[in-house]
Amino acid sequence: MSDDETLADVRIVLIGDEGCGKTSLVMSLLEDEWVDAVPRRLDRVLIPADVTPENVTTSIVDLSIKEEDENWIVSEIRQANVICVVYSVTDESTVDGIQTKWLPLIRQSFGEYHETPVILVGNKSDGTANNTDKILPIMEANTEVETCVECSARTMKNVSEIFYYAQKAVIYPTRPLYDADTKQLTDRARKALIRVFKICDRDNDGYLSDTELNDFQKLCFGIPLTSTALEDVKRAVSDGCPDGVANDSLMLAGFLYLHLLFIERGRHETTWAVLRKFGYETSLKLSEDYLYPRITIPVGCSTELSPEGVQFVSALFEKYDEDKDGCLSPSELQNLFSVCPVPVITKDNILALETNQRGWLTYNGYMAYWNMTTLINLTQTFEQLAYLGFPVGRSGPGRAGNTLDSIRVTRERKKDLENHGTDRKVFQCLVVGAKDAGKTVFMQSLAGRGMADVAQIGRRHSPFVINRVRVKEESKYLLLREVDVLSPQDALGSGETSADVVAFLYDISNPDSFAFCATVYQKYFYRTKTPCVMIATKVEREEVDQRWEVPPEEFCRQFELPKPIKFSTGNIGQSSSPIFEQLAMMAVYPHLRRVFYLNDSNLLSKITFGAAIVALAGFLVLKNL
Ligand SMILES: Nc1nc2c(ncn2[C@@H]2O[C@H](COP(=O)(O)OP(=O)(O)OP(=O)(O)O)[C@@H](O)[C@H]2O)c(=O)[nH]1
Ligand SMILES: Nc1nc2c(ncn2[C@@H]2O[C@H](COP(=O)(O)OP(=O)(O)OP(=O)(O)O)[C@@H](O)[C@H]2O)c(=O)[nH]1
Ligand SMILES: [Ca+2]
Ligand SMILES: [Ca+2]
């Protein structure tokens, strides 16, 4: 393929029996008049986009069976987006050639069930002869045949139309949308259109009201529908599809039926215009660009939802919380994510989130979910927001909408430290502790689950728990992440050591518990800027001496760590426990590390930290548990 060739959006290949007029057809198109003597075959022709009705660069390949060997023909066919099989209406044997030679050769090139459209072109239709009777059954019997046209290179009849149809067959292909055997929409087209319907049904009542239909129309075609047009659409639907319209609104069945009508009437471009607006490419998959916008995240920066992102996901919650109880029941939750390819919040990972007594996701838990994935798995946030329709309606001129606007990249952590402040909202806290130290109980408390809940969860496990925590008057998200270090010898990955704060848990009733924390601390966090804190668990039990060089309090003093905090029984199951506030606080104000250590409110009042100090005073009081 030459460089020019690769530029072509549409590649049309002409094949057919000898002498049926392939070269003449291309000549007539190029010269805009009949040319008597044509060469055996023409070189590749490249037609620039601006002279084609659909504005696509088109290449036309004229093949002559005499000159080309079959391998060459097959290789040209394979590169084609659409194939015109030319026959002569004055020569029946060329009609037979379609079924005996050309269609089989195309299948042999692409495979039995290929999707490359074929157009049957009956040339030399300048006399009285036609072959419609023989052609229609061929079209019926071979679903890859998109359409058939009779034309004449001599009189110019339908010459430009053929090439226009060929282009349209590529840009607005039928086969992904329509199953000619069953005369129904294909499964993937149904699925795509169901997604479109759900996104457009903005109040989630199952109907497209006139307003919703009009917005949809404006979105896809740029102009509103007149009220007569609206009525016409609804009448056409209810005539052919009894359950298509109810309450004077379009139902899902009606919406699908409407698209079936478009397709059956040859107006595929209408359905394609809709699908493309919602991110689909020709394969009816969402395009890579739509799903995964390009973004670079500099080292030390993190990703969070932008105000638009927050607004979008929060509106989704409103839309799907049908009974307005502030929680998503399993069916509401399933409904919300039904346009996504895989269920995202499962029985297991819902344990990372706050739920109500019945185990239903709260608004808080739902928002926390988005904050979590945006921090730890941005690709997944992009993908889900794309499926959920975030980009829809956000496309600028010449640019398909994408999900980039849903995200903001935070300032580098180093700069935050230098400036003693951050506008980040989501912070990550590692939870480190020996086996049985009480990590799960501690973490689940942030989601509001207590001992009994944890006992029920059993071995099911989420390595994350996230919730909203108040720091000063602001709310921040604290993401707890359990590190799976079975022994202090295990290596921590860079993802793990890059946390904003580390909580080391040790069981006061187990003499070997603290050694684990001390070892991991010294190995990974000593001399780093990451704030760390020791947390004593199972404090209602009798305290035993820890088998370590020094007791925990002494250890903390040596390393200038804050005194160990007691995670008392009263804190279990409490998402608003002051311990979580303290962790969030340490994550938000890491430069106050030494202040946390000094733990002296008199001294504190003498140092000026700007706004941070106000909150800190409050926190230090809370700290003496
Ligand atoms: N009456 C009539 N004759 C045509 C028409 N188109 C082509 N012909 C004649 O048919 C003959 C074959 O035309 P070509 O364009 O060379 O056919 P081709 O399909 O390119 O032939 P090969 O390259 O040999 O396979 C020539 O004598 C043309 O003048 C047409 O529309 N009407
Ligand atoms: N009495 C008391 N028991 C606790 C406390 N915290 C945890 N436990 C119990 O200690 C045991 C271990 O707690 P988990 O939270 O599962 O500990 P873990 O660190 O997650 O354990 P692994 O994941 O197996 O390493 C469980 O039986 C808990 O019920 C506490 O504060 N007081
Ligand atoms: Ca030729
Ligand atoms: Ca509605």
Swiss-Prot record:
Entry's Gene Ontology molecular function annotations: calcium ion binding; GTP binding; GTPase activity
InterPro entries: EF-hand-dom_pair, EF_Hand_1_Ca_BS, EF_hand_assoc_1, EF_hand_assoc_2, EF_hand_dom, Miro, Miro-EF-hand_domain, MIRO_dom
Binding site for GTP 1: 16-23, 62-66, 123-126
Positions of the EF-hand domain: 188-223, 308-343
Topological domain ranges for the Cytoplasmic compartment: 1-601
PROSITE patterns in the cross-refs: EF_HAND_1, EF_HAND_2, MIRO
PANTHER family referenced in this protein's UniProt entry, alphabetically: EF-HAND CALCIUM-BINDING DOMAIN-CONTAINING PROTEIN 7
Known role: Mitochondrial GTPase involved in mitochondrial trafficking. Probably involved in control of anterograde transport of mitochondria and their subcellular distribution. Plays a role in maintaining mitochondrial morphology.
Protein's recorded name: Mitochondrial Rho GTPase 1
Gene source species: Caenorhabditis elegans
Upper lineage: Eukaryota, Metazoa, Ecdysozoa, Nematoda, Chromadorea
